[in-house]
Amino acid sequence: MKSGFVAALSIVGLVVVLVTAVLLLPGPESAPGATTGSSENAGKESLAAPSLTAIVNVRVFDGESVLESANVLFSDGRISEVGRGIGVPHRASVIDGRGKTLLPGLVDSHVHAIGTAGAEAVEFGVTTLLDMFSMPVNLGQMRDQRQGLAPTARADVFTAGYLATAAGGHGTQYGVPVPTLSSPAEADDWVAARLEEGSDFIKIVIEDGSAFSGSLPTLSRETVDALVESAHRRNTLAVAHVSTYDDAMMAIEAGVDGLVHLFADRQVDTAFIEAAVEAGIFVVPTATVMASAYGGPGTEWLRRHEILAGRLGAMQRQSLAQSFPGSESRASMWANVEFNIGALHDAGIPILAGTDAPNPGTAQGVSIHAELALLVESGLDPVDALRSATLIPTRLFGLGDRGCIRPGCRADLVLIDGNPLEAIEASARVESIWKNGYRVPVQQPESSTAQEQTEGSKASPRPGESVDLLDDPTRWMAAADDYMGGKSSASIDWIRLADSRALQVRADVEQGFAFPYAGAMWNTTGIPMQPADHSGHRRLVLEIDGPGSDYQLMLFSGKAMGAQPIRAPLPVGRESVVEFGEMGGLDLATLRAIGVFATSPSDERRFTITRARLE
């Protein structure tokens, strides 16, 4: 899934994982109430007491319509009264809402809820997550949390659990056993097993890899038909991961309830729109991650919202700084995404906001605000965009008492400083959040002075001792996409040059994986992908010799093993100096590995790393 990239093949199938595959395993977030050290703000559950609260003179968007200058009262986890002129009891804790907008807690309709996803999401007003692929662990605890009204500083999670895919297909590349299907006859038992595990809906993968010049086994039309029929017979939603127009048409014809990615290979036409309208499907475009796949990393949006930067954890900042390999070369296809979103919306097809976090260019929680902005840029008005993250997913996924501000609704609330109903960018100005009626502590942005001091300390570490990476052969290993089910392979040998040691890499890069690669990787410790503090180093000096020009550097860092690598092209035949201060999102205090890879399919090649030094 995504811990690094789960729906990546979906819309992007560019799953860039090397030996980190084991670390990118799709698994649910920590059990409710658990604390973890992978996020600065995770586990902070010192919530305000559940007394009667009144937000007065506030603009209310109830999930469907707008009420100006209203009072909203809530206690014991539920909203009790909403309206103008409602009396406020003396015992109530009163919050002045003048100039502000109260929204229902937001729903992100496509994430991978791994690690501390729930804690990170809620800090930006996302109180419900729809997880599109994770291992079925702790699902009972997750269900208990969302059914109750106990204090929590984590978003509730509804999950697909395992996804339905073919043997060797998308979703099987993460190093964990995934129950696959090979025939329609297996569909009924497969669906029954998922529901027994606790899945809330069924996700079906229709993905042959062609959208990204790859080739993957995928489910037959007959098997997809059988899966949809089995899910519907059990009154369960069936949604589909697609990457192309043809895949989407197949899903619609099979009777799926919704598409959880949009495609960019072509624009929708009359035939597609008519089929979608007749079938009554919904669409989760995942515009944020598609923007990353087609040339727009999440930091571009974040630059317009600098106030949020101080509230982001290191993992979130690092993930936002990334985009998918080769995204710039596909930038022209982004216009198809915008057109398709607008055309589907104009045809009356429900659009749901979903980010596909934590893929490259996205981060839990904060990216929902970028998603809303992209939906508006694609043709939705701000009110419709907000509906896509509140009432619409609540109705279509059967989420019950969420996505609304009415008596009896769950008191999941977000107070915005401004009016996102007129300017959607205002949604990012999250001032206060309530989950189950309890006020959630919100990390306040650092002052600009504090940020400058922090950035300065990182930019000017004490000079570290120079490290020759070629001195210790035990730190090096071959790495290729065959580990992920691809067809590429690599091996390494040590050779002597005139007066030094060099690493010769045999790289056989072949089609058959969304992002083919083969090369070598240096681990900072004797254990692969374990972090070490290199904050005293300022640059990497590297030189490689070999045929071709398609070499790429990848720097792995971050508190969590599944963090996205920082990437940069590498020249051949001359010294390359990589200044770490220019590599946005790199955390030298937790540097894990440095990789050098060939990335274009070709006959077997040999290249040599003649110099590799940290300074």
Where are the regions a protein language model picked out?
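Histidine-rich, glycine-flanked metal-binding segment
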Residues: 36-52, 60, 64-103
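Active-site mouth loops of central-metabolism enzymes
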Residues: 104-114, 171-189, 237
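Acidic, glycine-enriched loop/beta-strand segments at the rims
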Residues: 42-45, 60-71, 84, 363, ...
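Active-site neighborhoods of metal-dependent hydrolases
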Residues: 189-212, 263-378, 450
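Beta-rich carbohydrate-recognition modules and glycan-binding surfaces
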Residues: 452-615
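Alpha-helix-loop-beta-strand connector modules within alpha/beta enzyme cores
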Residues: 148-156, 160-163, 217-240, 280-285
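Divalent metal-dependent hydrolysis catalytic cores, especially in the metallo-beta-lactamase
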Residues: 118-141, 154-162, 199-209, 237, ...
